[in-house]
Curated annotation (Swiss-Prot):
It catalyses: L-methionine + ATP + H2O = S-adenosyl-L-methionine + phosphate + diphosphate. This is S-adenosylmethionine synthase. InterPro entries: ADOMET_SYNTHASE_CS, S-AdoMet_synt_C, S-AdoMet_synt_central, S-AdoMet_synt_N, S-AdoMet_synthetase, S-AdoMet_synthetase_sfam. It comes from Shewanella halifaxensis (strain HAW-EB4). ATP binds at residues 15, 164-166, 231-232, 240, 246-247, 263, 267. The lineage of its organism: Bacteria, Pseudomonadati, Pseudomonadota, Gammaproteobacteria, Alteromonadales.
Amino acid sequence: MAKHLFTSESVSEGHPDKIADQISDAVLDAILEQDPKARVACETYVKTGMVMVGGEVTTSAWVDIEEITRKTVRDIGYTHSDMGFDADSCAILNVIGKQSPDINQGVDRADPKEQGAGDQGLMFGYANNETDSLMPAPITYSHMLVKRQSEVRKDKTLPWLRPDAKSQVTFAYNPDGSIAGIDAVVLSTQHCDSVSQSDLIEGVMETIIKPVLPAKWLSKDTKYFINPTGRFVIGGPVGDCGLTGRKIIVDTYGGMARHGGGAFSGKDPSKVDRSAAYAARYVAKNIVAAGLADRCEIQVSYAIGVAEPTSISIETFGTAKVGEELLIDLVRRHFDLRPYGLTEMLNLARPIYQATAAYGHFGREEFPWEATDKVEVLRADAGI
């Protein structure tokens, strides 16, 4: 059986869609800091010289949307019109309204534990054992490349870099599922007009790619595509408009797991699109960390206004050490997947979300859904 290839991509914090995600989550964090029970659905649109912030919010908090937006754009690095976008001169339009009372009555309960889901939907969580973070390697290293691009841009190691960038990594896998190596690397980065293509290629290769990608997976056959169009001066919101929630595969598993379709950024934890996807990652990671499977994908689904999940299913791709029915029983016993329960389980009603809005929501140990604190109880209950 031949080797097979799998590719994932990532984008930098300066990508237009990620600007939008970060603004939406910055607004969410500012509201949650004052009002942990707020209901927030914040959507952002960015284009040349303009940011529009909209959505539905019900809260006792007051936040300065304009200042939050300008600070977020400024921190990303868009601080001059030469870059195509300027945090201090762009127009900001605020069209936020209130959450529908029809939704509120389905979510709020006299007993908080019976809080209903904020919407119907299906969510997936995934983990595998091919990296230390129990994440797929293609998305992991794609994130690392654009994160490194941001670091060397901000510390001026490569002063000609600009905020917008994209990466893509293709891994080759052996028939047994182990990593054979890296087949191809793509990195496109916005840059100032004065840098030559040869200097850019050398700088990206030596300062970004080589320090990030393990040498053991690189070979003379690995293909590199660095700014393959030859020019990327026009970027950010001038090059493309940006929208919240348009990078859902970048945000999750790079395509290696299925996706329920719901985006994360700008949504408070009552929205199971976000909170249940985090809980599903928590479940899948603990199952793999406990040695109960080498790969695990879990699906949960909800009905609006109903607390209990309408379904839980698990797929281990033939790698389970115990029966999948037992795995589902273990999940039901040790993880509370009701909206209130998972918010409490992962301590989600707090301002932790802006940091998630670039470089992936999963595989980063600073987030509570990455904890592996259920490993021992799962192993004991499974009898292994």
